[in-house]
Amino acid sequence: MNPDTDSPIMPLFIILGKLTDKAVQKMRDAKERDEKAEEIIQAAGGRLISHYYTFGRYDFVATVELPSAEILASVIIDITRWGTVGTETMTALLPEDIYKMAH
C-alpha cells in the first residue's frame, strides 16, 4: 500500500536509456522530449517518479509506475518511435515486498 494514499502501488519499472546520435545533435530539444515522454506515461495511467541524466553506460535512468508490463511496453514503443532513445527496462520491487515473499 502507498502510505500517502492507502491505495495499492502500481508495478514499478526502471528504464535505462541511451540517447541516439539524433538526440545528441538536438539536445536543445531535450526538455520538450522529456515533457512529452512524461505526458505519454501519464496518459497510460502511470507516473514518472524520477528521471536523471547519467554518465557512463547509460545516458539516463527513469523510474516509473505503470499499471502493467504490457502498458510499459506500449509506452516504450511510443517513446522509442521518435528515434532518439534506446531503452532497457527492469521490474523493480520494494524491499518490503521481498520481505513478505521471504516469509
Where do the protein language model's features map onto the residues?
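A compositional/biophysical signature of low hydrophobicity enriched in polar/charged and small residues
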Residues: N2-H103
